[in-house]
Amino acid sequence: MMLPIFAVLVGIVIGLLFPISLPAEYGKFLAVALLASLDSVFGGLRAGLEEKFDNPIFISGFFVNALLAVLLVFIGDRLGIDLYYVASLAFGLRIFQNLAIIRRYFLKK
C-alpha cells in the first residue's frame, strides 16, 4: 500500500520540478486520458479490496482505456462532434461508482 502512495508523491515532485506546458488544443485529449486512467486506478483499488486484483488486467486496462478514450475524442474532433463530453461523462460515472463501492467497503468494515 505504501508503494502507490510513494509513487504518487514522487510523481508530484517531478511534476513540480519539471513543469511541462502543452498546447491548448490537447486539453480535451489529456482530460479524457486522465479520466480514463483514474477510472482504471479506482477500479484497480476496488478489485484489490475485493481480492480480485490481477496485475496484467490492470496494466492493460490502464493503457487501453486511455488510448481508446483519446481515439474516441480524436474521431469526434475530426467529425466535428464533441465526443469528449460522452467520454468524460462515462468515465466520471464509473469513477464515482467505484468510489461509492470503496466507501461502502470501508464503512462496513
Model-predicted segments: where are they?
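Structural signature of hydrophobic alpha-helical transmembrane segments
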Residues: 25-38, 84
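Alpha-helical transmembrane segments of multi-pass membrane proteins
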Residues: 15, 32-43, 69, 73, ...
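C-terminal ends of transmembrane helices
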Residues: 42-51, 97-105
